[in-house]
Amino acid sequence: VYKYYMKILAVQNRMGIGDTVIFLPFIKTISEKYNVPINLLVRDNSKAGQYLDETSYINQILILERNNNFNGRHDGLIGAVNLIKDLKDKNFDKIFIFNSSLRFNLIAKFAGIKEIYQYPLFKKKNQHIINTAKKFIEDSINTKIFDDPKIHIDKNTIENTIFKFKIKREDTNIILGIGGSGPTKRIPAKT
């Protein structure tokens, strides 16, 4: 049972479903450390709202409104001000930023978030997506407890899907396969 006395935000601004899934064990570890569900700031194309809405350690999914045309609500200087306002309204106590961005660091400070945990600034070159996140969490909250990524789906959704797609339980069925495209995004068979 979670106690809702602390509000924590995790920022995962990489694109895609696979990128978000890769970070789930680290977000879960933060949740377990502080015994609160985590708010998650992600890009819209992560589709996190479509597959993390049943995940017990995720409280709210906030969308980072940026796009390729650089005219999203959170793009540019005006966008940074909008994001500061959005985060300030949520009154977060802590933020975990899974990147080396000075922009997000300053946004967190101006939003009044007191405890900011982040990858080392200006050290983006050659970062391994998994190893960097693992070291970041180990160093930030002094814990080495990590699980494999898991997506929680309620039983009714599973049963409705089985019925809708006429899935036979005696057959081998692959329902969802998520992966990354680069060598630093591959999860080893044993983690």
Task: Please report, for each region that a protein language model flagged, where it lies by residue.
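Catalytic machinery of carbohydrate-active enzymes
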Residues: 1-191
